Structures are given as structure tokens and as C-alpha cells.
């Protein structure tokens, strides 16, 4: 949790680690980001890296996935910008469906 973002576990995890990083300020989704939102996006990325670091996934022999879902075809059901942080196992074939 920072001044601009919060992070919490997804209620329907698609991987052993599945955390959502959410800005406190409302933005509908990633398609609505503007140049003025650069600091918000940067803070979200830094928070996502912190989540991965805390989970031990940021090392050279590990990895994690960051995902923005936009619109109904991407199965986005949350009308607020959020970044999925996934990891904890090889992610071949993992897709976010909610």
C-alpha cells in the first residue's frame, strides 16, 4: 500500500501468486490512461515489482507476468484500472478470465 496504490490478493487466483495492484484514483481501464497519468502508471509498476520482490519472483531464474485486461472480450469485469501480478509457477497457458 502506498499513497497512490493498493495491492491485494485476487479472490479468484489464476496462479499461486495473483495480486491486483490498483490506483486509489479512479481510472476506468488502461485504455483511458493519458500522458498525465504517467506517474500513476509508474507507481503501479513499482508496486508490482515490490509484490514480485516480496514473493521471491524477481530473481534471474524466476519470473512473473503483469497483465491489464481491457474490455469485455478480455473478460474484464472490474470497472476500475487494475494490474494483475501473476507468478509462483511456470505460466505457460495461463490467461486471466476475470
Regions found by a protein language model. Give the residues of each.
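HIT superfamily nucleotide-processing domains
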Residues: 1-98
Amino acid at each position: 500500500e502506498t499513497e497512490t496504490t493498493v495491492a491485494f490478493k485476487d479472490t479468484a487466483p489464476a496462479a499461486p501468486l495473483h495480486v491486483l495492484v490498483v490506483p486509489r484514483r479512479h481510472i476506468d481501464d488502461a485504455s483511458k490512461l493519458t500522458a498525465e497519468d504517467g506517474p500513476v502508471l509508474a507507481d503501479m509498476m513499482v508496486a508490482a515489482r515490490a509484490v514480485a520482490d516480496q514473493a521471491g519472483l524477481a530473481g534471474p531464474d524466476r519470473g512473473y507476468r503483469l497483465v491489464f485486461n481491457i474490455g469485455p472480450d478480455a473478460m474484464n469485469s472490474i470497472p476500475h484500472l487494475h494490474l494483475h501480478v501473476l507468478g509462483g509457477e511456470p505460466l505457460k497457458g495461463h490467461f486471466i478470465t476475470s
